[in-house]
């Protein structure tokens, strides 16, 4: 009995001495749970050719904005009478166009926020050794729903109309490109540059600023799975809201469209975080089943936080300065419109337009079923996942148990022993 008494007394003495060490270990274990590793780059060998297009007779020059989430690809025309655009990118060696078939008709396209109408013509296109006939080209006039719509080039090839990506496959099978890859970046909100078959070397050589996310279905959409949204700049994963949404990327959209179920999330976790927020700061209006948030310009004079969407271990940022646009001024106040709008749907699908894509250079990689984003406007959350949170809890649990065994139990024994 004396042996056990001495043992516990020694434990009390050692426990009191080692208490700061256990606190230090507890702190270190917490820090270890927050470690982040770089996400490895999937190496993709670059192709050989870049692509620029001139279409129609007389020839019209186009910069293409690739939208493979639909069968159409938005383009901006240089000779369009309603287009204020002057760049001429026609390259005779890279692409030529033959006389179109003079088949012109009228059509209407619908999407989640309205419709676009214009004239369709069918053009034959020759790109290197590749030749395709009757490619759809829609020259769309601007309207209240699609202010940036100047033209549309279809990715659908008539011989295989069910596959919207098949032009990429046809180019690959023809030997004109070595990899089934589309790459583009925006020159501004209205235009961009397309390359087919290759990725610029400066992207493939820069592992730090290039990341990818997996395409999560087979419905001919370029989309990724977003798991969380972070509505502040603290970069604390545990403050991120779980959403598990399907992110559909569309260069034909200017804004981001989010299911209406998330409206309260943004109001409560984003707008109400501003120190000067009150009930009059922002209001919600419904236009054609789209819920829009209007805020007083004076309320937004204080710079607010960015918004981060976490996909495949990376947080992609939309900065505060890009989240609002001026809309109107009445007799008393000026208002700004929040560029994330909310629509009625039963699916958890988030549509990302140019407000997101203009932040990055984008690679559509049909070889590996990936989308890649290049730019330094993101943060690595690869190791900072729910599994790490469980490991973090495990570290703390073990530390508490050790603390209890080494200090608390001997102290209890000592107190009860003296009482006897």
Indicate residue ranges for each PLM-predicted region.
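Aspartic protease catalytic domain
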Residues: 33, 45, 66, 136-143, ...
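Active-site beta-strand/loop microenvironment that shapes enzyme catalytic pockets
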Residues: 68-72, 238-269
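Short conserved beta-strand and strand-loop elements enriched in small hydrophobics
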Residues: 52-55, 121-130, 184, 229-232, ...
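N-terminal signal peptide
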Residues: 25-37
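Short hydrophobic beta-strand that contains or immediately precedes a catalytic carboxylate
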Residues: 53-55, 62-66, 73-75, 152, ...
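Signature of the N-terminal lobe/flap region of pepsin-like aspartyl proteases
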Residues: 44-141, 146-148, 276-291
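Aspartyl protease catalytic domain
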Residues: 34-45, 126, 131-242, 327, ...
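Classical eukaryotic N-terminal signal peptides for Sec-dependent ER targeting/secretion
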Residues: 1-25, 420
